[in-house]
Amino acid sequence: MSLGLVGRKVGMTRIFTAEGDSIPVTVLDVSDNRVTQIKTVETDGYTAVQVAFGSRRASRVTKPLAGHLAKAGVQTGEILKEFRIEADKAAELSNGAVIGPDLFEVGQKVDVQGVSIGKGYAGTIKRYNFGSGRASHGNSRSHNVPGSIGMAQDPGRVFPGKRMTGHMGDETVTVQNLEIARIDADRKLLLVKGAVPGAKGGKVFVTPAVKTRAVKGAK
């Protein structure tokens, strides 16, 4: 249970180390994360912090949500996100407080969650990296078919989870243990090593890494 940030994927670029090594990074805009509600065990049954990100026209906000944000004294947001945290950390925050990239530090490992790019209806070759059939030598109109999907009368059905054609992408994906390569505090940017799910402009959630990789040989 850790506090995180809501951000927007700006795109990918690269930075250079002092030794001249090139590092591919994804730029995340995490500006203007503001607290809209502090949930406690007494009032809500659990402890969490609700954060708003981005902006939205007042005409596009429902009256209940507009009242909720007005009560907190917070500008209308494009998205609301809850982070479950400990009670002592929640007590340090208040409605309207702004959370910035200083929540993290360079070298820290984080988990980044986003919605992957939708690819539409795809075959098994593109979707699951299946191999193609033979181009000739007896193969007739079966070059890209997946092959058999079942057995005989017993069991007489296709097992659940069978890899077949279908909708590809547009799924919630979490990439774990990405390292923060650089923090631009002035522009509220996080530069994360490697790729992040989603297209440019997509929303992402950045939280401290849950699973840390063990160092081989360490005691």
Swiss-Prot record:
The keyword Ribosomal protein applies. The modification N5-methylglutamine is found at residue 153. GO terms for biological process: translation. The keyword Transcription does not apply. Methylated by PrmB. Pfam families: Ribosomal_L3 (PF00297). One of its GO terms (molecular function) is structural constituent of ribosome. Residues 133-153 are annotated as: Disordered. Gene3D superfamilies: 3.30.160.810, Translation factors (2.40.30.10). Disulfide bonds: none annotated. GO terms for cellular component: cytosolic large ribosomal subunit. Keywords: Methylation, Ribonucleoprotein, Ribosomal protein, RNA-binding, rRNA-binding. InterPro entries: Ribosomal_uL3 (IPR000597), Ribosomal_uL3_bac/org-type (IPR019927), Ribosomal_uL3_CS (IPR019926), Transl_B-barrel_sf (IPR009000). Part of the 50S ribosomal subunit. Forms a cluster with proteins L14 and L19. HAMAP family: Ribosomal_uL3_B. One of the primary rRNA binding proteins, it binds directly near the 3'-end of the 23S rRNA, where it nucleates assembly of the 50S subunit. Belongs to the universal ribosomal protein uL3 family. This is Large ribosomal subunit protein uL3. It comes from Burkholderia thailandensis (strain ATCC 700388 / DSM 13276 / CCUG 48851 / CIP 106301 / E264).
